[in-house]
Amino acid sequence: MEVNILGLIATALFIIIPTSFLLILYVQTASQGSKS
């Protein structure tokens, strides 16, 4: 049970962290593009 929960947490972090990072980069690029 604990292993499954830790696995889900690790998988969630592995997916959320890169996704949020790319999302932030996209938002910054989009905002800069609209400004200029």
Curated annotation (Swiss-Prot):
The organism's place on the tree of life at top rank: Eukaryota
Entry GO terms, CC: chloroplast thylakoid membrane; photosystem II
Subunit structure: PSII is composed of 1 copy each of membrane proteins PsbA, PsbB, PsbC, PsbD, PsbE, PsbF, PsbH, PsbI, PsbJ, PsbK, PsbL, PsbM, PsbT, PsbX, PsbY, PsbZ, Psb30/Ycf12, at least 3 peripheral proteins of the oxygen-evolving complex and a large number of cofactors. It forms dimeric complexes.
GO BP term, example: photosynthesis, light reaction
Name recorded for this polypeptide: Photosystem II reaction center protein M
InterPro entries membership: PSII_PsbM, PSII_PsbM_sf
Pfam families: PsbM
Keyword Chloroplast part of the UniProt annotation: yes
Sequence intervals crossing the membrane: 5-25
Main location: plastid
Recorded family membership: Belongs to the PsbM family.
Compartments (UniProt record): Plastid, Chloroplast thylakoid membrane
Membrane topology field: Single-pass membrane protein
UniProt keyword terms in alphabetical order: Chloroplast, Membrane, Photosynthesis, Photosystem II, Plastid, Reaction center, Thylakoid, Transmembrane, Transmembrane helix
NCBIfam families cross-referenced by the UniProt entry: PS_II_psbM
Function statement: One of the components of the core complex of photosystem II (PSII). PSII is a light-driven water:plastoquinone oxidoreductase that uses light energy to abstract electrons from H(2)O, generating O(2) and a proton gradient subsequently used for ATP formation. It consists of a core antenna complex that captures photons, and an electron transfer chain that converts photonic excitation into a charge separation. This subunit is found at the monomer-monomer interface.
HAMAP family cross-referenced by the UniProt entry: PSII_PsbM
